[in-house]
Amino acid sequence: MAETFKIRKLEISDKRKGFIELLGQLTVTGSVTDEEFDRRFEEIRSYGDDHVICVIEEETSGKIAATGSVMIEKKFLRNCGKAGHIEDVVVDSRFRGKQLGKKVVEFLMDHCKSMGCYKVILDCSVENKVFYEKCGMSNKSIQMSKYFD
């Protein structure tokens, strides 16, 4: 049976479809209770189109196969312009090689364009540079970070 995929915004029921476990393939998630998930989901939803999480669901199994998010930053630069920040793009290891990551990035970039953003940016590992170049992005700067434990 052929796999079919549907891209859409995150729904509250997606926790039961492996959403948190999928994020665990990207980085540390910790244990997120249903109550914590529901609270964070409602908080993010309250931001409307300024914070969007998309998922790709494999329709036969109902599992979340890929995800990514974007936050819209409102600036004073560029005539009070907006910039999109893509984060947390991950494709389940079982579904890699099917262009799902590219579909997630395109979905998020399309959202940024529809919101009137003048640019979209993201941070990625050196290993993922070629993937993002294939999505139409180019190396612009160096990322700096400081983690607070």
Curated annotation (Swiss-Prot):
PROSITE patterns: GNAT. Acetyl-CoA binds at G97, K98, Q99, L100, G101, K102, Y132, E133, K134. Its EC number is 2.3.1.4. Substrate binds at T27, K75, F76, L77, R78, E87, D88, V89, Y118, K119. Expressed in roots, leaves, stems, cauline leaves, flowers and siliques. It comes from the Eukaryota. Its main location: endoplasmic reticulum. Residues 5-149 form the N-acetyltransferase domain. One of its GO terms (biological process) is N-acetylglucosamine metabolic process. Disruption phenotype: Retarded vegetative growth, delayed flowering and short and thick inflorescence stems and siliques. It is found in: Endoplasmic reticulum membrane. GO terms for molecular function: glucosamine 6-phosphate N-acetyltransferase activity. It catalyses: D-glucosamine 6-phosphate + acetyl-CoA = N-acetyl-D-glucosamine 6-phosphate + CoA + H(+). Optimum temperature is 35 degrees Celsius. Keywords: Acyltransferase, Endoplasmic reticulum, Membrane, Transferase. Optimum pH is 7.0-8.0. Changing G68S: In lig; reduces activity 2-fold. Retarded growth. Acetyltransferase involved in UDP-N-acetylglucosamine (UDP-GlcNAc) biosynthesis. UDP-GlcNAc is an essential metabolite that serves as an initial sugar donor for N-glycan synthesis and thus plays an important role in protein and lipid glycosylation. The mutant lignescens (lig) was originally isolated as a temperature-sensitive mutant that exhibits ectopic lignin deposition and growth defects under high-temperature conditions. Homodimer. Belongs to the acetyltransferase family. GNA1 subfamily. This is Glucosamine 6-phosphate N-acetyltransferase. The gene is GNA1.
